[in-house]
Amino acid sequence: MDRRALLTGISLSLALPRFARAGDFNTFLAALQARAAAQGIPQSIITQTTGNLVPNADVLKLDHHQPEFTETWAVYSSHVLNQARIQEGMQKAGASQNLLTAITSRFGVGAGPLLGIWGIETNYGTTQGDFDVIDALTTLAWDRNSDYFSGQVISAMRIIVNGDAPAQKLIGSYAGAMGQPQFMPSVYLSTAISFSGNNQPDIWTSDADSLASMANYLAKAGWHAGQPSSEAVLVPASLDISATGRENMRTIGYWVGQGVQRLPGALNLPSDMPAALLLPDGAGGQAFLIYANFRVIRHYNPSDYYALAVGALGRMVLSA
C-alpha cells in the first residue's frame, strides 16, 4: 500500500495539531509547482515528483519533537566516538587508502576530516536515511512557510532534470539531507563531483564520489592544507578561562605561555599560528586548541561538538 495514502483522515489530523487547515497544503503545493515551472523545471518532472504529495506525518513528528535537552561534551562524545565507529573507521581508512591519497592530492584535504565527517554523518554510508527527499522537503516548506525548503525542492527537481540521479534515488534524512555526505540538494548541485569523471556524482552508493564531494566542500569553504582542525591539550588548574572560547583567537605560543600543554605526537605547528582554547564542558573538562580549519568544519555543521568530534574521530581512525 502507498505509504502516503495512509497519511489521511484522523491519523493525519492527530499528527498535525498546529496547522491542519483545510486546503492549505494544496494551495501551497500549487504555488510551489508554479514556482518550479517558472524556473524551468519541466511539467513532467513536477507532476512525477509532487503530483500526489500529502504532508508527511513522520517528517512533521520528527521535526516538531526534536530533543530539547542539552548534552555535555563528555556525554555526546561517548555516544559519537564509540568503539564500533572507530573500528569501522580504521577498516575504511585501510581499504580506502589509495582513494584518500588521490583525493588529498587533488583537494588538499587530508584523510582525517573526511573519515570523521563520513563516520559521524552516516556511519560510513550505512545510515543515510530512508525518506523521499522531495516529499520531506515539500512537507517542511509547507509547515514552516519556508522559502529555503521550497528552494531545496526545486534544486532536487533540477538534479533529476540534469540527469544526475532519478527521482527514486533521492533518498535521505527527514530534513532533506542526501547520501553519504548528507548534502542538501542545492549543495549537491554546487559541490558534488564525480571522482570517476562521468559527470553524474553518485553520493549514495559511490564512496569515491562521496569522499571527493566532501573534500570539495571543505576546500571551497577555505580548508588550510596540512593543518589540523583541533587537538586535545592539557590546561593548568590556574588558567584564567575568561580568555577561552571559539572567538578568542590568540596563538599557539600564547597558550603555551599560559601553561597549556600539547600532547606527545602533536603536529609540529608554528608558535605564531592562530589558535583558540575551547573548554566545551567548562573548567575541569576536556580542553582543545582549535584552529582555522575548525571553522571550516563548522561550515559543514555549525556545532562545536560536531567539529570537535570530526577532528577526534579522524585522529582516532588514523592512529592505528
Map each language-model feature to its residues.
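An acidic, Gly/Ser/Thr/Pro-rich helix-cap/linker signature
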Residues: 23-95, 104
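N-terminal export signals
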Residues: 5-22
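C-terminal soluble interaction/assembly domains
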Residues: 239, 243-320
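Non-transmembrane alpha-helical segments in soluble domains
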Residues: 33, 157, 215-219, 311
